[in-house]
């Protein structure tokens, strides 16, 4: 193989098409892989079946918002009665740590039938009041 002393582009200067032929002149883009066209035409059946959310604006995620994982007293009571959430006994008190379970807020919807001490990051005033009326208490222990 011959070693070029100069680049081929130097030799091709002034040749108009630079060696890419008379018709296309290297202007086509070839196969574009995943860039699909015809979603309103020939690929419509694929779009209907698999392309949920293909068109339209889809919003954005606000980077300053903090996600809150909340649980209501109603749901907590159901989980306690079904045995899904285990109650820990410490110094004669029944303790439920919602922070360990992935919840960081206790809401006041519904009621609770078991007097327990609940550890959670945040709680509404109504939730605290309902737990105290039942004979339990809410310990606010922020996580983060």
Swiss-Prot record:
GO cellular component, one term: cytosolic large ribosomal subunit
SUPFAM superfamilies: Ribosomal proteins L15p and L18e
Compositionally biased intervals (Basic residues): 1-14
Molecular function GO terms recorded: rRNA binding; structural constituent of ribosome
Family statement drawn from the similarity comment of this UniProt entry: Belongs to the universal ribosomal protein uL15 family.
Role noted for this protein: Binds to the 23S rRNA.
Full protein name: Large ribosomal subunit protein uL15
Organism listed in the record: Saccharolobus solfataricus (strain ATCC 35092 / DSM 1617 / JCM 11322 / P2) (Sulfolobus solfataricus)
Native organism taxonomy: Archaea, Thermoproteota, Thermoprotei, Sulfolobales, Sulfolobaceae
The gene coding this protein: rpl15
């Amino acid at each position: 193989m011959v070693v070029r002393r100069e680049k081929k582009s130097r030799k091709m200067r002034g040749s108009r098409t630079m060696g890419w032929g008379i018709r296309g002149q290297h202007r086509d883009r070839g196969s574009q892989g995943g860039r699909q066209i015809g979603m309103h035409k020939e690929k419509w059946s694929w779009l209907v079946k698999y392309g949920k959310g293909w068109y339209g604006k889809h919003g954005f995620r606000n980077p300053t918002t903090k996600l809150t994982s909340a649980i209501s007293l109603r749901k907590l009571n159901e989980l306690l009665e079904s045995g899904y959430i285990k109650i820990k006994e410490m110094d004669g008190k029944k303790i439920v740590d919602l922070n360990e379970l992935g919840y960081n807020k206790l809401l006041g919807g519904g009621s609770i039938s078991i007097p327990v001490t609940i550890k959670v990051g945040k709680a509404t005033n109504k939730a605290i009041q309902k737990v105290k009326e039942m004979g339990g208490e809410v310990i606010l222990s922020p996580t983060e």
